[in-house]
Structures are given as structure tokens and as C-alpha cells.
């Protein structure tokens, strides 16, 4: 009788836990320790500019923020992906979405997909004022710095 009672308790606890616990998503990048230059080299586009949100777009079951940019300088643009200077990023940071403060300058990099330009936390998207001076110097003075 005691054994049956323990079994019922364990089953009840497992049922309650399975209802309470939901799937959690987390952004994880691979490889995890890429340098700025490595991120720059694998991106389809890299530019310096100021972004502003122009809306939300749904693709499948995911929602994306659409940022458009006032571009100061283009460092890399494969396949003329910056003809339309806008890009999508996931609304959720747990899905590697990124945010840009309006009016601030950022280094922005990403990929051209069927849905348009995509940017995320695993690419080189960083406030320009946080980029080290030597990296800025290399980026501006060495045209090969971002090329594979």
C-alpha cells in the first residue's frame, strides 16, 4: 500500500512539472568565439550606419522587426544586397534578434536570404563607439580586412 502511494505521488509530481515547464529558447552562436574580423568575413554585407524601425513583418510563425538604415559607409556588399538598405531581425532576443537605438551609429552585418537581408546577434552588430580604435583603423584602411 505504501509503495502504491509513493508511485501515485511521483506520477502526480511529474504531471504537474510537465504542465509547469515549457520549452525555453536561447540564442546560441556557432562557432561561439568568433572575432570581429571572422564575423565580417563570413557576412554578405557589412556597413556603418544608423538604424530605425519601420515595422513588424511575419514570416511563417516568427515575427521580425524591419530596420532601415541611413548608411554612412559600406565595407562589404555581396550580390548588391544593400540596394534596399533594410534588414530583418527576430523580435525575440532568445531567437538572436538585435536592437538598434535610433540615431546611434552601428556596424551592421548579415546575410541575404529569400526573405531579404537578415541580421542577428551572431553577426557583427555593434555600436560603433564600442569598436576598438585599431579595429576601426583596419576596417577603414584595409579593403581586404572583411574579405574571405
Swiss-Prot record:
CC terms in the record's Gene Ontology section? extracellular matrix; extracellular space
State the UniProt keywords alphabetically: Disulfide bond, Secreted, Signal
Domain named NTR is located at: 27-146
Q: Which InterPro entries match?
A: Netrin_domain, TIMP, TIMP-like_OB-fold
Q: Which compartments is it annotated to reside in?
A: Secreted
The chain's disulfide connectivity reads 27-96, 29-122, 40-146
Q: What is this protein called?
A: NTR domain-containing protein
- Its source organism is Margaritifera margaritifera
Task: Please give the Gene3D superfamilies that the UniProt record associates with this protein.
Answer: 2.40.50.120
What does UniProt note about where in the body, tissue by tissue, this protein is expressed?
Prismatic layer of shell (at protein level). Expressed primarily in the mantle with highest level in the mantle edge and lower level in the mantle pallium.
Indicate the secretion signal residues: 1-26
Question: What are the recorded GO MF terms, alphabetically?
Answer: metalloendopeptidase inhibitor activity; protease binding
Kindly list the biological process annotations in GO that this record carries.
negative regulation of membrane protein ectodomain proteolysis
